[in-house]
Amino acid sequence: NYTIQDYVNDSISTFVDASNKANVPHPNIITESGRSLTAHHSVLIFEVLETTTLPSWEEEDKIADSDHELVKDLFQLWEKVNQSRMLETWHDAQQIREEALDKFSFGLIDLRTRAQIEKLFWSIAREVHIMSSKTKHIPDEIRQISRMLSDKYFCNFSLFQSLPDAWAIDQIFPIMPIHRLNEEPLRTATIQDMTCDSDGKIDNFISTRNSPHQIPVHSLKGKDSYYLGVFLVGAYQEILGDLHNLFGDTNAVHVSVDSEGYKIDQIIDGESIAEVLDYVQYNSKKMVRTVETWVTSSVKAGIISLEEGKEFLSNYRSGLYGYTYLE
């Protein structure tokens, strides 16, 4: 979100001001701008595994006389929402949802009612968001709805292993889909990694629009793979990465480019589960022997068949010596 000229101006102005105030000659400046020089050589590419979208009230959903009063109140808000009352409607919807969540936590409403509340609340949020886009002056509370409505794209990587600066110092990296570029991305999303950590997400992006907390993405197409690229990661991300949740080094491909095109120089396999377990003093060979002993005794005791034992051992070895990420 700044140019090289901006960067130079800010850096040099400090020296100029200090030199002028001290009435001394301007110095020769020698700098090593690490990220600027080295970041460009590396790109992180990962697959989107799954997505979640907030629920919505569908046409087939009906309100029954037996439904909870909070559901009926929220349904009336949704039916009557309009541009002139959108802020009031949003406040009322938030209040009803909060009351419903409190009652749910005390066991006073059931799971079905909770689901109805969620569907109606997020349907109201979408309506208010659409209406607000047609107004000149949007209240800050309404602006926040856009961020709340983003999908979550769960991706096959570890933020702490591959993009530690995004977590540690809020570094913003350029991120975008690397295919389907002839299609307009109609969804917006935040990125979630594979770790169990709530910090394992990216919700701050480079953006020329007023939506830096979400990224434009495409909807997934059935079982077709969908990949995102994170650029300018060559400045020490791989070196700084750690083994949070025991996700290891990723697969790497060295590519050289010349006037005639590109060629793949080297393919380096990422770490296996056995390798990362070794870091925390687990002996993979001993683990396999232990499982082999259990399988042998189970076959002899008639607990499992010989074929089941062979299949179990094959799957165990395959997992243990396989990639730490999903394959």
What are these regions (language model features)?
Residues 1-5, 52-54:
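Glycine-rich tight-turn/loop motif centered on a GG-T
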Residues 4-18:
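Alpha-helix-loop-beta-strand connector modules within alpha/beta enzyme cores
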Residues 18-24:
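Short helix-capping segments at alpha-helix termini
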Residues 24-28, 33-327:
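Charged (often Lys/Glu-rich) extended helix/loop segments that serve as interaction or gating elements
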